[in-house]
From Swiss-Prot:
Pfam families: DUF1516. The keyword Cell membrane applies. InterPro entries: UPF0344 (IPR010899). The chain crosses the membrane at residues 2-22, 32-52, 55-75, 97-117. HAMAP family: UPF0344 (MF_01536). This is UPF0344 protein GWCH70_0687. Belongs to the UPF0344 family. It is found in: Cell membrane. It is a multi-pass membrane protein. GO terms for cellular component: plasma membrane. Keywords: Cell membrane, Membrane, Transmembrane, Transmembrane helix. Its main location: membrane.
Length: 117
């Protein structure tokens, strides 16, 4: 299940940057990519929930990682919707960067992740 989760969030991040670039260029396919991105949000949340459910003793750090992961998805949506409306997205980008760094740090630090830290 770990590999499915890593694959889903990796595809989610790639689709996010594709959606951002299409949104900036004003391409008509941006809406299709955003719908695919939202589908991968669901895959990421489901696989993350299944991973969380499979842990015998859940540390508070896993709960924090899940909350930060949901925050990251929210930040992605704030960036894309702000760009679509033509608003300033600096705050949303800062939130995205902070949440992304936190979720990666927690993901790699916890026992189900890789031994990077």
């Amino acid at each position: 299940m770990t590999h499915a989760h890593i694959t889903s969030w990796l595809i989610t991040v790639i689709l996010f940057f594709i959606a951002v670039s299409l949104q900036r260029s004003g391409a008509s396919k941006a809406k299709i990519v955003q719908m695919a991105l939202r589908l991968f949000y669901i895959f990421t949340v489901i696989t993350g929930g299944l991973l969380l459910h499979s842990i015998a003793s859940i540390s508070i750090l896993y709960i924090i990682k899940a909350i930060v992961g949901l925050w990251l998805i929210g930040a992605m949506e704030m960036v894309l919707s702000g760009m679509k409306k033509g608003k300033n997205t600096n705050v949303a980008w800062i939130q995205w960067i902070v949440a992304f760094v936190l979720v990666l740090f927690l993901g790699f630090m916890l026992p189900l992740g890789f031994d990077l830290f």
